[in-house]
């Protein structure tokens, strides 16, 4: 019974909700376990109602006059709330900042490989920091770094948006790209469509107790060959 799960302070509650004997008001407006309005009751009578059902009296609106309380299984309520929070956390997308480093004169094959990586990062809803590293005299040719970053922007225009424009920081020129919202929405739409199509593609199972389909009729046996008159002589 829920009434057995109260803490030593006089009621199974938490800091955000008073329960049972922790409720300080002398009278409260009570909502029943099924959501029915029970009216304004003295606190002892409200507690008795909850105890009769093996449930808790929970103060859900302490600032009301009088406070509003609801009869519920508070232990189960807290369990379900925590379960919902855990499920929500699992669904949350944790955005990470991934970095890809380039040079002012990056070889074509290396460039293509790294652009492919950036596409993967963005498709996973992560952000990407594109950094151009300068060495020695390359610092006097910063326009090469700008050309590299501009090329990246053009090559990723379909999947990325600029979150932080190119800028210098020491011997590095970098920018930050974020996933294009249209691309992410398109991915979600495709996933929903695939999920909806999956059950339809599966063959329907026969209903329980339904007779098995009749076997296809066998092919007729071939007619015997006519005797050769020459062979009979």
Swiss-Prot record:
InterPro entries: T_IF-3_C_sf, T_IF-3_N_sf, Translation_initiation_fac_3, Translation_initiation_fac_3_C, Translation_initiation_fac_3_N. GO terms for molecular function: ribosome binding; translation initiation factor activity. It is found in: Cytoplasm. Residues 1-21, 184-233 are annotated as: Disordered. SUPFAM superfamilies: Translation initiation factor IF3, C-terminal domain, Translation initiation factor IF3, N-terminal domain. Residues 193-211, 224-233 have a biased composition (Low complexity). It holds the Pfam family IF3_C. Keywords: Cytoplasm, Initiation factor, Protein biosynthesis. IF-3 binds to the 30S ribosomal subunit and shifts the equilibrium between 70S ribosomes and their 50S and 30S subunits in favor of the free subunits, thus enhancing the availability of 30S subunits on which protein synthesis initiation begins. Monomer. Belongs to the IF-3 family. This is Translation initiation factor IF-3. It comes from Anaeromyxobacter dehalogenans (strain 2CP-C).
